[in-house]
Swiss-Prot record:
Molecular chaperone. Has ATPase activity. It comes from the Bacteria. Homodimer. PANTHER family: HEAT SHOCK PROTEIN 90 FAMILY MEMBER. Belongs to the heat shock protein 90 family. It is found in: Cytoplasm. This is Chaperone protein HtpG.
Length: 614
């Protein structure tokens, strides 16, 4: 029987183990990720040695990781055929923290207090000790790759010392057996172990078995050359990573060495689940380092508006166990975010040019996310604006143009980009706001979503051209001379008297009544001082107050026969005139899309009918 040596842990190790053993971690199952990652690293080192022609013990051993849960013994064993360790390696790698940052690491872990994050343990290359979160004893056997190396057994309860003894007839590699704590017996159950492996270690580059079942059956496609991957493989990978049953609409697969080393494989689903009332989508991009999961549904790796994307970002430059706190403040994460987002936006721009029908399908499903990004993402705003698409007065129904298309065909002398919001194309085109634009042959963008006006208000201009709503009061679109005296049915004096009377009748509902130089066929129009009418509608609905309508400008068309007839009634001091004036204003509100209280209008219409039918 070989002699058993007992050694004391280095001071920093004792401090580390004390913190690990006596702390409660909410995500302690991460220990298995650490041990599998160590096994994969050990296997990679042996593979490199074999490729470089070095003499390696047990050349025929397959490079695989075998995990054996034993519910009866309450143990969990992780075994690899990797590089293994000599006696010196065991003392150096496990008995001490063999680098200058050890004291700083232990100090940081101690200072974390109640907010300790298990991820900190792996940041300094000491992930092995996470085993003591779930085990009250760890037994390790190991044999180095060196042909004449002796095998050794290492054991510890994590209380301050460890033992080393020789072990005969060991294969190359390392086997770690965890004798599980009473509150950690679930880790001896095969189903629990399989779930953890699938969550954290699905893509390690070596087979991982639980019993005889291979768990990591899906390849890490993002690390492969895209020319070597079939369409079917991409589809199956998407279904796995997105937990989806359908096929993706689009995918982007790219690798980059500068400004940061990364591999990314992102998919766009076919459906926007937020549209169906399933609530706000969670982030869908997982962050990996060397095929090992760092964070599932990483919120910081892409902007909030890109939450519809599904896939993987993998960077070897990340610390394997970057903590959640560090994620939020890391300059490296910020750089990853910027690179991935810019590449994805370029990908969408390429799709718009090369696959317009697919991009149109994407736009119909996910336009709301790009609009959210245009309003809130200052870093990528200009890239996003190129992707926005709208119908217009110069397109057919369902035909979309970009802001760039609009600017490219602006009329000579046109100073701004004009847009109008309404529930449907028909309602917009039947309203009075397009009349002056039709006369001038100016194109007007049609927007149908409430967020559109908010987006345009936030971005304010595109390509040096202001974005102006067609219902704004200060557009300066009319010809200088306006309507000729012959065309007007009212003299200048009568017009002033009529406007003053109308202002008096309507009171605080309007700030001003004036002659319109933009109307052709309609008798009156309401223009907005602030914001747009669609934003006013939103405020009315949010406040649940149909009376909460900001006073606007009422413009009248002195060429219209209705205005002439109303003026005649005014001059006759007919009691019908104020009722008609109120209804004229209500009609203009309805044309503007402003929600009118129907009860007051019905009462007024009944009175109008009563007088008309006498």
């Amino acid at each position: 029987m070989s002699q058993i040596e007992t050694k004391e842990f280095q001071t920093e190790i004792r401090q580390l183990l004390d913190i690990v053993i006596n702390s409660l971690y909410t995500d302690r199952e991460i220990f298995l990720r650490e041990l599998i990652s160590n096994a994969a690293d050990a296997s990679e080192k042996v593979r490199y040695m074999q490729l470089s022609g070095q003499n390696v013990k047990d050349q025929e051993l397959p490079l695989e990781i075998r995990i054996t849960p034993d519910e009866n013994a309450k143990t969990l064993t992780i075994a690899d055929a990797g590089i293994g360790m000599t006696k010196e390696d065991l003392i150096e790698n496990i008995g001490t923290i063999a680098h200058s940052g050890s004291k700083a690491f232990v100090q940081r872990l101690a200072e974390a207090g109640d907010k300790k994050d298990v991820n900190l343990i792996g940041q300094f290359g000491v992930g092995f000790y996470s085993a003591f979160m779930v085990a009250d004893k760890v037994s390790l056997t190991s044999r180095s790759y060196e042909p004449d190396a002796q095998g050794y057994r290492w054991e510890s309860d994590g209380r301050g010392s460890y033992s080393i003894s020789e072990e005969m007839d060991l294969p190359r590699g390392t086997s770690i057996t965890l004798h599980l704590k009473e509150d950690a017996h679930s880790f001896a159950q095969a189903d629990t172990v399989k779930r953890i492996i699938k969550q954290y270690s699905s893509f390690v580059p070596y087979p991982v078995y639980v019993g005889e079942e291979k768990i990591n059956t899906v390849q890490a496609l993002w690390t492969k050359n895209k020319n070597e991957i079939s369409e079917e493989e991409y589809k199956e990978f998407y279904k796995y990573i997105a937990n989806a049953y359908d096929e993706p609409l689009m995918r982007m697969h790219f690798s980059s060495d500068a400004p940061i080393n990364l591999n990314a494989l992102l998919f766009v689903p076919k459906s926007n689940m937020e549209k169906f009332g399933f609530g706000r989508m969670e982030a869908g991009v997982n962050l990996y380092c060397k095929k090992v999961l760092i964070q599932e549904k990483a919120k910081d790796i892409v902007p909030e508006w890109l939450r519809f994307a599904r896939g993987v970002v993998d960077s070897e430059e990340l610390p394997l166990n970057i903590s959640r706190e560090t994620m939020q403040d890391s300059a490296l994460i910020a750089k990853l975010n910027k690179v991935v987002t810019s590449r994805f936006l370029k990908f969408l721009d390429d799709q718009a040019k090369n696959e317009p029908e697919i991009f149109k399908e994407f736009w119909n499903e996910f336009s709301i996310f790009l609009k959210e990004g245009a309003a809130n993402d200052f870093t990528h705003r200009q890239e996003i604006l190129k992707l926005l698409r709208f119908e217009s007065s110069k397109t057919g129904e369902g035909e979309l143009i970009s802001l760039g298309d609009y600017v490219g065909r602006m009329k000579e002398g046109q100073e701004a980009i004009y847009f109008i919001n309404g529930p449907t194309r028909q309602i917009i085109e039947e309203g009075p706001y397009l009349e002056v634009f039709k006369n001038k042959d100016y194109e007007v963008i049609y927007t149908y979503d409430g967020i559109d006006d908010y987006v345009f208000d936030m971005i304010r201009e595109y390509d040096g051209k202001r974005l102006l709503s067609a219902d704004h009061g200060d557009l300066n679109l009319a010809d200088e001379d306006g309507a000729s005296a012959e065309e007007k049915l009212l003299s200048e004096e009568e017009l002033k008297e009529f406007n003053d009377w109308l202002k008096e009748v309507l009171g605080e509902k309007v700030t001003e009544v004036r002659e319109s130089k933009r109307l052709v066929d309609s008798p009156a129009i309401i223009l907005s001082h602030y914001g747009t009418h669609s934003m006013q509608r939103m405020m009315q609905l949010m406040n649940r107050d149909l009376q909460d309508v900001p006073a606007g400008i009422l413009e009248i068309n002195p060429k219209h026969v209705l205005i002439q007839r109303l003026n005649d009634l005014r001059k006759q001091e007919d009691s019908f005139a104020p009722l008609a004036a109120e209804q004229l204003f209500a009609n203009a509100q309805i044309a503007a899309g402003i929600i009118v209280d129907p009860r007051s209008m019905v009462s007024r219409l009944n009175e109008i009918l009563e007088k008309a039918l006498r």
